[in-house]
Amino acid sequence: MDNEFLTRKDLSLKAKGLLACMLCLPPDWRFSIEGLAYINKESESAISSALRELEQFDYLRRSYPRTEDGKIANAVYTICDIPIVEYEALHGESDDALN
Protein backbone atom coordinates (compact mmCIF):
# COMPACT_ATOMS: atom_id res chain seq x y z
CA MET A 1 0.00 0.00 0.00
CA ASP A 2 1.36 3.40 -1.00
CA ASN A 3 1.12 5.78 1.97
CA GLU A 4 0.88 9.04 -0.01
CA PHE A 5 -2.79 9.41 0.88
CA LEU A 6 -1.94 9.33 4.60
CA THR A 7 0.10 12.53 4.27
CA ARG A 8 -2.54 14.55 2.41
CA LYS A 9 -3.71 17.54 4.42
CA ASP A 10 -6.87 17.95 2.34
CA LEU A 11 -8.18 14.46 3.21
CA SER A 12 -9.84 13.93 6.59
CA LEU A 13 -8.49 11.45 9.12
CA LYS A 14 -11.79 9.56 8.87
CA ALA A 15 -11.37 9.12 5.10
CA LYS A 16 -7.70 8.17 5.45
CA GLY A 17 -8.50 5.54 8.07
CA LEU A 18 -11.37 4.07 6.09
CA LEU A 19 -9.27 3.88 2.91
CA ALA A 20 -6.43 2.16 4.80
CA CYS A 21 -8.92 -0.33 6.24
CA MET A 22 -10.51 -1.00 2.84
CA LEU A 23 -7.12 -1.56 1.22
CA CYS A 24 -6.27 -4.19 3.86
CA LEU A 25 -9.42 -6.25 3.29
CA PRO A 26 -9.23 -9.42 1.18
CA PRO A 27 -9.77 -8.89 -2.57
CA ASP A 28 -13.00 -10.90 -2.48
CA TRP A 29 -14.52 -8.88 0.38
CA ARG A 30 -17.95 -7.52 -0.53
CA PHE A 31 -17.97 -3.84 0.28
CA SER A 32 -21.10 -2.27 1.70
CA ILE A 33 -21.79 0.70 3.92
CA GLU A 34 -23.33 -1.62 6.49
CA GLY A 35 -20.35 -3.99 6.48
CA LEU A 36 -17.82 -1.17 6.73
CA ALA A 37 -19.78 0.38 9.60
CA TYR A 38 -19.83 -2.95 11.42
CA ILE A 39 -16.10 -3.68 11.17
CA ASN A 40 -15.13 -0.09 11.98
CA LYS A 41 -17.61 0.55 14.80
CA GLU A 42 -18.80 3.70 13.03
CA SER A 43 -22.27 4.80 12.07
CA GLU A 44 -23.46 4.20 8.53
CA SER A 45 -23.72 7.97 8.19
CA ALA A 46 -20.04 8.41 9.12
CA ILE A 47 -19.02 5.70 6.65
CA SER A 48 -21.17 7.26 3.92
CA SER A 49 -19.57 10.67 4.38
CA ALA A 50 -16.06 9.17 4.32
CA LEU A 51 -16.91 7.24 1.15
CA ARG A 52 -18.20 10.42 -0.51
CA GLU A 53 -14.95 12.16 0.41
CA LEU A 54 -12.91 9.29 -1.05
CA GLU A 55 -14.98 9.55 -4.24
CA GLN A 56 -14.40 13.30 -4.36
CA PHE A 57 -10.62 12.74 -4.24
CA ASP A 58 -10.88 9.80 -6.69
CA TYR A 59 -9.61 7.05 -4.37
CA LEU A 60 -12.98 5.32 -4.73
CA ARG A 61 -15.41 4.76 -7.55
CA ARG A 62 -18.76 3.08 -7.09
CA SER A 63 -20.72 1.67 -9.99
CA TYR A 64 -24.21 0.27 -9.90
CA PRO A 65 -24.66 -2.50 -12.47
CA ARG A 66 -28.10 -3.77 -13.37
CA THR A 67 -29.33 -7.32 -13.08
CA GLU A 68 -30.76 -9.18 -16.07
CA ASP A 69 -34.24 -7.99 -15.12
CA GLY A 70 -33.12 -4.34 -15.01
CA LYS A 71 -32.93 -3.89 -11.24
CA ILE A 72 -29.97 -2.08 -9.72
CA ALA A 73 -27.55 -4.58 -8.20
CA ASN A 74 -25.24 -4.01 -5.24
CA ALA A 75 -22.61 -1.33 -5.71
CA VAL A 76 -19.25 -2.40 -7.09
CA TYR A 77 -16.38 -0.59 -5.35
CA THR A 78 -13.12 0.25 -7.12
CA ILE A 79 -10.48 1.48 -4.66
CA CYS A 80 -6.87 2.46 -5.02
CA ASP A 81 -4.11 3.83 -2.78
CA ILE A 82 -3.47 6.63 -5.28
CA PRO A 83 -6.16 8.60 -7.11
CA ILE A 84 -7.66 6.28 -9.70
CA VAL A 85 -7.10 8.78 -12.52
CA GLU A 86 -3.36 8.71 -11.69
CA TYR A 87 -3.38 4.90 -11.62
CA GLU A 88 -5.06 4.81 -15.02
CA ALA A 89 -2.49 7.25 -16.43
CA LEU A 90 0.33 5.01 -15.21
CA HIS A 91 -1.17 1.61 -16.03
CA GLY A 92 -3.84 2.18 -18.64
CA GLU A 93 -7.56 2.46 -18.07
CA SER A 94 -8.24 -1.13 -17.04
CA ASP A 95 -9.69 -1.66 -13.56
CA ASP A 96 -8.42 -5.27 -13.52
CA ALA A 97 -5.62 -4.61 -11.01
CA LEU A 98 -7.70 -2.37 -8.77
CA ASN A 99 -9.63 -3.65 -5.79
Regions found by a protein language model. Give the residues of each.
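Long, low-complexity, charged/polar intrinsically disordered regions in eukaryotic proteins
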Residues: 1-3
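Charged low-complexity intrinsically disordered patches
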Residues: 79-99
